Amino acid sequence: MTSRILLCSYRGEAYLEEQLASIEGQTERNFRLLLSDDASPDRSFAIAEAAAARDARVTALRRDKGSGSAARHFLERLRDPAFFSAADVDDYYLFSDQDDCWHRDKLARQVRAMRAMERRYGSKVPLLLHCDLRVVSADGTEIAPSYVRYQKMSPARRRFCQLLVQNNVTGGAMIMNHALMRLLVAHPVPENAVMHDHWIALVAAAFGKIGFLDRALYDYRQHGDNVLGAKKGGALSEMKRRLGLSGESLKEMNEKSGAAYRALFLQAEEFRRQ
């Protein structure tokens, strides 16, 4: 069994070296890391090449032209032979963001928990396990020890109908077994997917099982370039967020609410067609 990690970078030079060091320093040593750069204009690919030169477990690739979005880049590389092979039925799969920082035991703990899930449900069942994370500032100062509690999320809400309207699975927190990855490779994530992690959670809920490891296993860095950041949750703020009511005017509220629900409906319709 090998753990296969996919890290897609774009303009990541500020934090990429720290994240690579955290992955290379994992207590679980049996892994392969595919680092794909999205035609970054900065030093991201040079950092990736240096990692590949010093560590045989790392493969560095670079797109000639930018993909246009982080989600599209990730989904394209899912099917890359350097990441997924249909023959390697015992492998596990993880994603990494370029600006996170893994705790030394992240991989070991998630592998152990996934093995326990496979013993319980069987390795042929599509399985996804996700963990908690620590929210930190750009310089690594702790903002919250638990992302789940900071956002007032409930990982127990793992049924398909619940995840359809509110995702609580973060891409960098996931580990997936081969059965789930085989489904994702066979049925590409559509353009209408809200985010790749949301779609993957829906697939796991519909066709397999989702587990949660209640332990923060990496640092989720908040800075100006985050695609999606962590914001403190609460009953009122959560209601406003779900309804898109964070605009300053009624028109903005209506537009945001309409756009949010259209995206969810389109994703649900796409899933039905699949």
Regions picked out by a protein language model, each given a short descriptive name:
Residues 153-154, 220-225, 229-273:
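Catalytic core of nucleotide-sugar-dependent glycosyltransferases
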Residues 1-233, 246:
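Nucleotide-sugar donor-binding/catalytic module of glycosyltransferases
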Residues 159, 273-274:
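Helix N-terminus capping/helix-initiation residues
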